Swiss-Prot record:
Subcellular location as annotated: Plastid, Chloroplast
Function: Usually encoded in the trnK tRNA gene intron. Probably assists in splicing its own and other chloroplast group II introns.
Protein name: Maturase K
Keyword set, alphabetical order: Chloroplast, mRNA processing, Plastid, RNA-binding, tRNA processing
Pfam families named in the record: Intron_maturas2, MatK_N
Domain of life of the organism encoding this protein: Eukaryota
PANTHER family listed in its UniProt record: MATURASE K
Source organism: Schizorhiza neglecta
Record InterPro entries: Domain_X, Maturase_MatK, Maturase_MatK_N
Family as reported in the entry's similarity comment: Belongs to the intron maturase 2 family. MatK subfamily.
Length: 522
């Protein structure tokens, strides 16, 4: 019991007071505008000019916003009148102002709450002298590890982390990290107001869906804190169910600009939960070989143990969410499968274990005999069906995979249209470079290439055949990666559609720190 209480003891040194005054600083919102609102780095978000404002007008709106936050009666009028959006100074029908102000506040607030964690990132890395820690942020960093480890495991559990999450639970989780009471009150007030402004993001019971296309930076941070709280309990259970010494290392994969190591996320209420339930069931089984990986709302748990052992872990997770987070979680959302005959979807790949049998004839004196050798290989494939569904949602093709034009891009220049399609194709090729079978990826490239030609033909009111003949090799080269372009210069005639290496050659890149948008949509 003393060991359990010591493990859950709160670390007050991590709490940072006096963050609330930062809400009234202009540079916070200027920083949020540069890092959050301007999403030119994403291929599925239009530039800010499309919404009708630029950096100059946004600066004026920031000053107006700070002035309104200073007015104390302004908050009271906003709470008393739920039909009028007084927090932004306009009625609900003025979508531009409500959308801009709420987005600006959420982005600025996200930067403020990230400050306590950003200050703690440099010192732990220097103290422990972790070499090339930036490589650990890569999503592809997980696959070489899976290649080496999954060959020796028996079962895999596909876990869907439950959402939506009630707003009060999110605020209570942050109370363990931040002791600035005004800031927490402002967060609670903002989330309730955000529920009134954007009812399509939040359900009627005031729970937040965190995987919408329009999910803001603040909600990504709140989701990370929620998942870290869940994984903290799992780390505790893992430490006490293993014979071996366990070291946890966690990354915030959902945040592109925020990377952290969390070791102590504590809550006193959790002691009661663990003592009441886990203390009776945890010590009844041990699992010395278990691995856990997560990205966004999906996690996998692989083990060398038996099916009964995996079921015990399954019900531990179910009870965790029901008793601690007060979330009714159905057990069917956790699937237990045998690795030898099951493919699981994770990080944009369909992964499985392939068994290859080879026969060798041996001759010894007058006797000859055959030796059958069975080898197991970790295989990763491109989920073609999922990607086609994502392309159809993004209006690049139909559900059946037939390419269509992109009408929203017809206002761009020809070079701009070709560059956008080419960038999407190159990003997909870069992300799925670890696939052992790339034929499916070539089909995705064909859909994007023909969709680009149809978009250009629609813009100029011409035929696809005309533009294919006019652009020729230029249109083709835009859809090559750098490696494919180098190979096309060497063998321009022998290979009409050059490939980088063999069909089964797998390359894992350590510079990919977020999932491709098309993969994320699937």
């Amino acid at each position: 019991m003393e060991e359990l209480q010591g493990y859950f003891e709160k670390d007050r040194s991590r709490q940072q007071p006096f963050l609330y005054p930062l809400l009234f600083q202009e540079y916070i919102y200027a920083l949020a505008h540069d890092r959050g609102l301007n999403r030119n780095g994403s291929i599925f978000y239009e530039p800010l000019e499309v919404f009708g404002y630029d950096s100059k007008s946004s600066l004026a709106l920031v000053k107006r916003l700070i002035t309104r936050i200073y007015q104390q009666h302004f908050f009271l009028s906003s709470v008393n009148d739920s039909n009028q959006n007084r927090f932004v100074g306009h009625h609900h029908t003025n979508f531009f102002y409500s959308r801009f102000y709420s987005q600006m506040i959420s982005e600025g607030f996200a930067i403020i709450v990230e400050i306590p964690f950003s200050l703690q990132l440099v010192s732990p890395l220097k103290e422990k002298e972790i070499p090339k820690s930036h490589n650990l942020r890569s999503i592809h960093f997980n696959f070489p590890f899976l290649e080496d480890q999954l060959l020796h495991f028996n079962y895999v559990s596909d876990i869907l982390i439950p959402h939506p999450i009630h707003m009060e639970i999110l605020v209570q989780i942050l109370q363990c990290w931040i002791q600035d009471v005004p800031l927490l009150h402002f967060l609670r007030f903002f989330l309730h107001e955000y529920h009134n402004w954007h009812s399509f993001f939040i359900t009627q019971n005031k729970s937040i869906y965190l995987f919408s296309k329009e999910t803001k930076r603040l909600f990504r941070f709140l989701y990370n804190s929620y998942v870290s709280e869940c994984e903290f309990v799992f780390v505790f259970l893992r430490k006490h169910s293993s014979y071996l010494r366990f070291t946890s290392f966690r990354t915030f994969l959902e945040r592109r600009y925020f990377y952290g190591k969390m070791e102590h996320l504590q809550t006193e209420h959790l002691i009661i939960v663990c003592c009441d339930y886990f203390n009776r069931t945890l010590w009844s089984f041990k699992d010395p070989f278990m691995h856990y990986a997560r990205c966004q709302g999906k996690a996998i748990l692989v083990s060398k143990g038996t099916h009964l052992l995996m079921k015990k872990w399954k019900y531990n997770f179910v009870n965790l969410w029901q008793y601690y987070f007060h979330f009714w979680y159905q057990s069917y959302r956790i699937h237990i499968n045998q690795l030898s005959n099951h493919s699981f979807y994770f990080l944009g790949y369909l992964s499985s274990l392939l068994k290859n049998s080879s026969t060798v004839r041996n001759q010894m004196l007058d006797n000859s005999f055959l030796i059958d050798t069975l080898t197991t290989k970790f295989d990763t494939a491109v989920p073609v069906i999922f990607l086609i569904v994502s392309l159809s949602k993004a209006q690049f093709c139909t559900v059946s995979g037939h390419p269509i034009s992109k009408p929203i891009w017809t206002d761009l220049s020809d070079s701009g249209i070709i560059e956008r399609f080419g960038r999407i194709c190159r990003n997909l090729s870069h992300y799925h470079s670890g696939s052992s079978k790339k034929q499916g990826l070539y089909r995705i490239k064909y859909i994007l290439r023909l969709s680009c030609a149809r978009t250009l033909a629609r813009k100029h009111k011409s035929t696809v055949r005309t533009f294919m003949q006019r652009l020729g090799s230029r249109l083709l080269e835009e859809f090559f990666t750098e490696g494919e372009q180098d190979l096309s210069l060497i063998l321009p005639k022998a290979i009409p559609f050059p490939f980088s290496g063999s069909h089964r050659e797998r390359i894992w890149y350590l510079d990919i720190i977020r999932i491709n948008d098309l993969v994320n949509r699937s």
